[in-house]
From Swiss-Prot:
It comes from Baumannia cicadellinicola subsp. Homalodisca coagulata. One of its GO terms (molecular function) is rRNA binding. GO terms for cellular component: ribonucleoprotein complex; ribosome. Part of the 30S ribosomal subunit. Contacts proteins S5 and S12. GO terms for biological process: translation. Coiled coil: none annotated. Gene3D superfamilies: 3.30.1370.30, 3.30.1490.10. The gene is rpsH. This is Small ribosomal subunit protein uS8. Keywords: Ribonucleoprotein, Ribosomal protein, RNA-binding, rRNA-binding. One of the primary rRNA binding proteins, it binds directly to 16S rRNA central domain where it helps coordinate assembly of the platform of the 30S subunit. Belongs to the universal ribosomal protein uS8 family.
Amino acid sequence: MSMQDPIADMLTRIRNGQTAHKTILFMPSSKLKVAIARLLQEEGFIKDYKVEGNIKKKPVLKIFLKYFQGKPVIENIQRISRPSLRIYRKKTALPNIMGGMGIAIISTSKGIMTDYTARQAGLGGEIICHVA
């Protein structure tokens, strides 16, 4: 059976991993998943990420989850745009998550970036997910 929405699967693995207090998650890798993991690390939501695997093996994305005083750093991670219903926003209509305490990950013509970076660059795009 093929996976219909690999990004939703990634976000669900992160959500379930933090609920189970896991420190490391493993999942199939893709360029989009690595870009999302890079943003989550830059914004301080995860400790680190690594892509492992060689030519014969399929690449695996390892995500190291982050906790503060025993509680997950990511309180809420939610998929917004999905294959059956794409959500696009102009630069003036980009969401502000929790008054700037959270981020929206946006797919723009210049690549994957946070809502703050997209607003500064004057770009709109597809809203992939919200993280708080």
